[in-house]
Amino acid sequence: MENREFILAFQVMDRIIQNNQPIFMLVWVGSVVVLIATVALGIGQLYGAGLMLVIFAALAYLLGVQLPTVIINIPLNNKLQTLDVDAISETARKLAREDFDPRWNRWNLIRAVLSSLASALLIILLFRL
């Protein structure tokens, strides 16, 4: 995909997500609330490996998914949103993409792996109950 089209496509996708889509916001914020509630309930009802599973799942998700989203991916998205791709040169578009794409994808991979780990830990916990 050419630089102009890449930036435009990402801007459109990000604009839709950041436009306070109620379902997206419910899932994104709700996942944090539910996971914190799960840990709070787990502290009172789980012990040993079960408690460790829920705590590690929460840490993986909160520190490995939510935190990088807030401090890395969203700021990168916002920086890309400021570009007027038709008003800048192809060189500027190329530099913007090179500044954005590798870092965003690296952190997105980290978020995906840690989100999968958190899910796997919670599934293991369910089978142990």
Question: Where in this protein do the model-derived segments appear?
Answer:
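Inner-leaflet juxtamembrane helices
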Residues: 60-85
